[in-house]
Amino acid sequence: MYPFIRMAKERVVNRSKQSISVGEIHESYHICWPWDLDFWFELNNGRALTLYDLGRIPFSGRSGFSKVILKNKWSMTMAGANVRYRKRLRAFERIRMQTRTVCWDKRFLYIEQSMWNTKKECAGHIVYRAAFVGADGIINPQRIFDEIEKNLLSPIMLSLIHISE
């Protein structure tokens, strides 16, 4: 079952935060609960993807994506992901998550997310390839960025994806 209570918490916590620009980091905090664990008593890989959702959805609101998507009756879908699990996250461990826009091309937006444990080690990292979709199919992300901020161009795609502390 999708964690609706956690989503409600994220909406309440983030509704009064100021908006962020492209490339700025949205930071959120989560806890690894016992029901998030697998047989080895660490964060289940599938639940980790759900936690990334919980970081990405408020990010979409703060960055202006949600407003443009709702106004135009579009949607945003994840078209691919490259994930790395680096360190174990155990029960009741506090997780700091960072989310940011990396770049975009004519079809996709690339979003980077990372999870950090209490020792300030990167516990997990993912890069999503997201598509904005309308009635006629995939929408060029530049249209979304033009509505958020005029004349905004994508950063250079190569060598931008990194983990920062």
Residue ranges and their predicted role:
Residues 114-117:
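Core beta-strand residues in small-molecule sensory/regulatory alpha/beta domains
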Residues 1-39:
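N-terminal leader/capping segments at the start of a protein or of a new domain
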Residues 108-112:
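Short aromatic-glycine-enriched beta-strand elements
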Residues 59-103, 125-131:
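Hydrophobic beta-strand-centered segment that forms part of the acyl-chain substrate-binding groove
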Residues 161-165:
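Conserved small/polar residues in nucleotide/adenosyl-binding loops
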Residues 28-35, 45-57:
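Early exported N-terminus immediately downstream of N-terminal targeting peptides
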Residues 120-124:
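Residue-level signal for glycine
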